[in-house]
Amino acid sequence: MDACFSTQLIDGDGVFNVSGLENFMKEVKMGECGLSYAVVSIMGPQSSGKSTLLNHLFRTNFREMDAFKGRSQTTKGIWMAKAHNIEPCTLVMDLEGTDGRERGEDDTAFEKQSALFALAVSDIVLINMWCHDIGREQAANKPLLKTVFQVMMRLFSPRKTTLLFVIRDKSKTPLENLEPILREDIQKIWDGVPKPHAHKETPLSEFFNVEVVALSSYEEKEELFKEQVASLRDRFQQSIAPGGLAGDRRGVVPASGFSFSSQQFWKVIKENKDLDLPAHKVMVATVRCEEIGNEKIASFTADEEWQQFEEAVQHDYVPGFGKKISNLLDRCLSEYDMEAIYFDEGVRTSKRHQLESKLLQLVNPAYQNILDHLRTRTLEVFKESFDKSLEKEGFAVAARDCTKVFLEKFDKGSEDAAIQQVKWDPSKIKDKLKRDIEAHVASVRAKKLSELCSKYEGQLTKALAEPVEALLDSASEETWPAIRKLLQRETKSAVSGFESAMASFELDEVTQKELLSKLESHGKSVVESKAKEEAARVLIRMKDRFSTLFSRDADSMPRVWTGKEDIKAITKTARSASMKLLSTMAAIRLDEDGDNIENTLSLALVDTARPGTTDRSIQSFDPLASSSWERVPEEKTLITPVQCKSLWRQFKAETEYTVTQAIAAQEANKRNNNWLPPPWALAAMAILGFNEFMTLLKNPLYLGVIFVVFLVGKAMWVQLDIAKEFQNGFLPAVLSLSTKFVPTIMNILKRLADEGQRPAAPERQREMELQPKSTRNGSHSNVTSAGSSSITSSESGPEYSSPIAH
């Protein structure tokens, strides 16, 4: 009997025992029953043996009346227990007896409330009645039946309740005779009960299945009573099966919602409101399905496998995420379906959708993390693969192929992460990946193009810089045409190579033109940069050119100022060349547009030295008094006219010293070469020495002596090379001649003595003897032997050689 878990459901004051019912539900494991359960309640007069009948019929342990202590109220309120060894699970409710003296005749409220509650929750209602009351007008069961029928009008139930009339203390009258009388009495009571207008003509059979059973007296025929009860017990086995006592299962509340349903029933009954069982069924289903859904959400959140997934997706991509999460969701929803299967379908489905939506809300952040990790991983692998592809393929082909491959990989990865229960669209993440890939491709393209541009710009710079510098250094009329030709040739070569290298990028025409134009502009900028550099050094270049032309002759040999050179003409030529260099460097001439810079500079700077030019310059407008050149744009101007004028003034000032030094050197050379007395001295000598001159002419001896002296002097002049010695200065010449004078005199005298002692010989033999000596001694009369001397002849006269010991 202990397995019946007897519990007071509602006490005598009408207070519902919520905690007691919850414990009872757990003890009997009602949550596992679903719709496979039945509720049986019993009504009847007080002390009519209701509890005794239930205890024998269902083997419960309800408190029974002790006949030896007198008849009094035993059951207060409503009690509940579980029938023992009856399938399906059967709940038994023992109601407080009617017409008890404890409540009095006027207190029928609780009777009606408990009756209504029993009809609302029960599948089978046992009406316990005395056999001797059948057919009596004032029978004890009539008020009870009236109460049952009256409260039934307040129940809007779609199902029929089974009323099982249990006739107690059966007499000798057969049941076949008693049953028609009982049914007739029941019909009369039904007809006499006030009904709503909609049910004025509704027969009793629409609301109840009436069954009648008779039992012998428990006190007088206990064994027979027990046999009859055992037979009746068999009818409660599988009572919910079709044809059973509780065969009509329409509107039944699932077992898991029984507790809440009972509470709500009693609450509405206590508020004296009509019970709309269909609406109540929906309400119970709504609350219970909501509870089941919340339980499943809590269960899903606490699931260890889900927590592991949730943690894993925070850090990296998880393969098979979609399938695994789908299985978890399926399991959770299946559990919900199993627990909520017996509730109202509409409510169940609605709450299932809500549960699914909430579960998906829980899963969505993890799904988004998976896609983000997939996008990040795909992008990283794309970058590596793209870099490798660039080593084998052209840029555009590699970018196109890699983009296609990795977008397809993302699609496969997103399919792997897809959850079966929902069709989340990964297109936004894919679009972001596509934008990231395009941004990376654009970045690499820009980098590669920049490297390519730098490469060809470097080549162009290398091809132009030094040649342009050399051409600008030469600074002639052909300088800028040569630079233009060089620029055109090298730019064309660079553009051709750059264009071929760009082909793999498959750039649009506009971009190609921009890059090619940039390369062409770079070539011009190199030339312009070099021109500006050279323009900054133009003064140095001008001085170098002037120095080169002024200090060196046409054969690039150092110029010696002997006195015969035209320094003025040389200076003008050198300055004109420097002026041409200045005019060349004054402007950038990459276009073939003509200008008059050279003419302007020539007129303003060089031609001012001509007679009459100075006066005209003073009277007319200065062409260099301007900040720009005629027909030359400002951006092409390297040196303005005013700057040219200033540079020329500085140039002249810094080269004036060189010219002055040349003039001084020429004058000094002239002085050194002029060893004759001044003309006035010669005139004085002629006047004052006229008498002596006439004496010499009149005396032949003097003339002979003078002739000999002339020959000796001539020989000394040639032998000592006096003219050359004096070119080195007066004092050095005197010192050099003083050391050579005596040896030379001795050499000459010795040679004359030798010549006088030799016999006369033919002239030809003499020439042959003298020729080797002349060749051996050389044009500078170098010493060949310490004790020999010879006399040679040349075109300029006899030449004497004197040996000098080395």
Curated annotation (Swiss-Prot):
Enzyme class: hydrolase
Source taxonomy: Eukaryota, Viridiplantae, Streptophyta, Embryophyta, Tracheophyta
Location(s), subcellular: Endoplasmic reticulum membrane
GO cellular component: endoplasmic reticulum; endoplasmic reticulum membrane
Disordered: region residues: 756-806
Cytoplasmic membrane side: 1-676, 722-806
Protein's organism: Oryza sativa subsp. japonica
Originating gene: RHD3
Polar residues: bias regions: 772-783
Record protein name field: Protein ROOT HAIR DEFECTIVE 3
Primary role: Probable GTP-binding protein that may be involved in cell development.
